[in-house]
């Protein structure tokens, strides 16, 4: 089953932390979940968040805290913090709640699956050969110290009439092993022939289980 399921969801609360941290009763849960999705979709479209690797949403008594994980913190912060203040104002308007924005820098972007997938997508959109983009990504990930990496692209590759999938793999990527720290992400490239889907798996080694205190007693959700 590890081959078919999402590696992140498969390991959530085992070796992966929740991406949304809050409690909601039966009446609030659906509302909070939809609000989380709106926040993420809004941030993904912002130019200042283009280098973002992910978002964590935390709720505390009428207040929302959004942590943006990015390889380019200066772009998100803006000149004298202007961009962050703008994000706060727009998110407050979207949610009708006070929103606090935190910035967390991704120290090693070559080992972040989302940033690698986005990089491949941008290259394909610039008409770089998909095979060249995939092989270059594999090499940079392995050079950064990963134990294994797998990259898959799907769609009308190189303008072919029939859609297909191709993948390259280097090293070990054990999808069934729960203690294996597998980072996984998807991205899409918009081309003149249609949408090209990209999937990236990166094996970062073995990891200890997440402490129970991080998820005990919380009806959290791992919305992407």
Curated annotation (Swiss-Prot):
Is Electron transport included in the keywords of this UniProt record? Answer: no
Q: Which GO terms describe its molecular function?
A: mRNA binding; rRNA binding; structural constituent of ribosome
Q: Between which residues do disulfide bridges form?
A: none
The KH type-2 domain extends over 39-107
Q: Which GO biological process annotations does it have?
A: translation
Domain of life, per UniProt, equals Bacteria
The UniProt entry, under InterPro entries, shows: KH_dom (IPR004087), KH_dom-like_a/b (IPR015946), KH_dom_type_2 (IPR004044), KH_sf_prok-type (IPR009019), Ribosomal_S3_C_sf (IPR036419), Ribosomal_uS3_bac-typ (IPR005704), Ribosomal_uS3_C (IPR001351), Ribosomal_uS3_CS (IPR018280)
Decide whether keyword Membrane is in the record. Answer: no
Which family does the UniProt entry place this protein in? Belongs to the universal ribosomal protein uS3 family.
Q: How does it assemble?
A: Part of the 30S ribosomal subunit. Forms a tight complex with proteins S10 and S14.
State the function annotated in the UniProt record. Binds the lower part of the 30S subunit head. Binds mRNA in the 70S ribosome, positioning it for translation.
Output this protein's name.
Small ribosomal subunit protein uS3
Organism of origin? Chlamydia trachomatis serovar D (strain ATCC VR-885 / DSM 19411 / UW-3/Cx)
UniProt gene name: rpsC
